[in-house]
From Swiss-Prot:
Retina and pineal gland. The gene is arr3. Gene3D superfamilies: 2.60.40.640, 2.60.40.840. The keyword Electron transport does not apply. PROSITE patterns: ARRESTINS. One of its GO terms (biological process) is visual perception. Pfam families: Arrestin_C, Arrestin_N. This is Arrestin-C.
């Protein structure tokens, strides 16, 4: 059984509808996105007189829940796709996927298939980290699949009759990458005949979350100043492009080195920096992958755009850069009072590696309740509380 195909399920609070999905994360390959397909089990009583629908929604939330109580809505649906699963509409019958066939055999005649194809221009799942005192749902882009009944797909339903699941749209690092970033600068100081040269480079273009980043620093100090401080910072730049032109820059890693470079000397060294969410828990507005407070959440991955894609529909764009900064000053007690900064910037692409291809050829299907884990190891029941309210 452990080698079976894992399937996730979520049941409505009234127990009448259960939605099954093969995965929680759906990969955006830039040219296409993995289809969202699954099965929905409907109580026989519902099948007699009710229509049952499945809907997938991509939404952008850019305000707090409590503001909606006074009539202000800070949620915008970017993309909505729905289908009627019962009674099935004529002419819409599609071939079942291999996993749907296994689920159909396991779940019986009260189960019905559904499938959605995401548009390629949708944003990936991103959450903006709230501050310590913030409450309610976090701002960001999320995807939801829900099963519900009603006379019409637009009908407002009781939360007790809805089975809702939050899924994620993710991007993985491409199998091929470009040239490793490199930058250099030459700085001429007053009272010095020769300049200071700073050169910085990375070993590769794409880095994975949690992987140490090697920053190669080369300094040719032909001046009469002393380089007293070398600082390397990793910055996250978040462009909120859907409703405004807001841009947020957050330092996610900062390392100050004790190395010094004397006047008229050269210096070469490779440093390691590792930006981690664990060191940035309190930073409000930091972009994270997917929904917050889950054990598999990390700093947001760099956004990859298809050529010609409209950036505005992407909602939130995330990028990173590494800054290498030198503080140069004259010797003596008063030297630091007239110090000068010399810096270069390197682009950084931070992503997840593409996981190994899974298999759905096993005979058994392992069904797991659709619940992620909080960072503290407790079940995330935020959605269940909302549905029961």
């Amino acid at each position: 059984m452990a080698d079976g195909s894992k399937v996730f399920k979520k049941t409505s609070p009234d127990g009448k509808i259960t939605v099954y999905l093969a995965k929680r994360d759906y990969v955006d390959h830039v040219e296409f996105v993995e289809p969202v397909d699954g099965m929905i089990v409907i109580d026989p009583e519902y099948q007699k007189e009710k229509k049952v629908f499945v809907m997938m929604t991509c939404a952008f939330r850019y305000g707090r829940d409590d503001m909606e109580l006074i009539g202000l809505s800070f949620r915008k649906d970017i993309y909505v796709q729905s289908c009627q699963v019962h009674p099935p509409l004529p002419g819409e019958k599609k071939a079942l996927t291999p996993l749907q066939e296994k689920l159909k055999a396991k779940l019986g005649g009260n189960s019905f298939p559904f499938s959605f194809n995401m548009a390629t221009n949708l944003p990936c799942s991103v959450t903006l980290q709230p501050g310590p005192e913030d409450s309610g749902k976090a701002c960001g882009v999320d995807f939801e699949v829900k099963g519900f009944w009603g006379d019409d797909v637009e009908e407002k339903n009781s939360k007790k009759n809805v089975a809702r699941l939050i899924i994620r749209k993710v991007q993985y690092a491409p199998e091929t990458s470009g040239a490793a970033p490199h930058a250099e600068i030459t700085k001429q100081f007053m009272m010095s005949d020769k300049p200071l040269q700073l050169e910085a480079s990375l070993n590769k273009e794409i880095h994975y979350h949690g992987e140490p980043i090697i920053v190669n620093v080369k300094i040719n100090n032909s001046t009469n100043k002393i380089v007293k401080k070398i600082k390397i910072t990793v910055e996250q730049i978040t462009d909120v492009v859907l409703y405004s032109l807001d841009k947020y820059t957050k330092v996610v890693c900062c390392e100050e080195m004790n190395d010094t470079v004397a006047a008229n000397s050269a210096f070469t060294k490779a440093y390691q920096v590792t930006p981690l969410l664990a060191n940035n828990r309190e930073k409000r507005g930091l972009a994270l992958d997917g929904k917050l407070k889950h054990g598999d959440t990390n700093l947001a991955s760099s956004t990859t755009l298809r050529p010609g894609m409209d950036k505005e529909v992407m909602g939130i764009l995330v990028s990173y850069k590494i800054r290498v900064n030198l503080m140069a000053s004259r010797g003596g007690i008063l030297g630091d009072l007239i110090s000068s900064d010399v810096s270069v910037e390197l682009p950084l692409i931070l992503m997840h590696p593409k996981p190994a291809e899974g298999t759905t050829s096993a005979e058994d299907v392992v069904i797991e309740e659709f619940a992620r884990q909080k960072l503290q190891g407790e079940q995330d029941d935020e959605e269940d509380k909302e549905e029961a309210s």
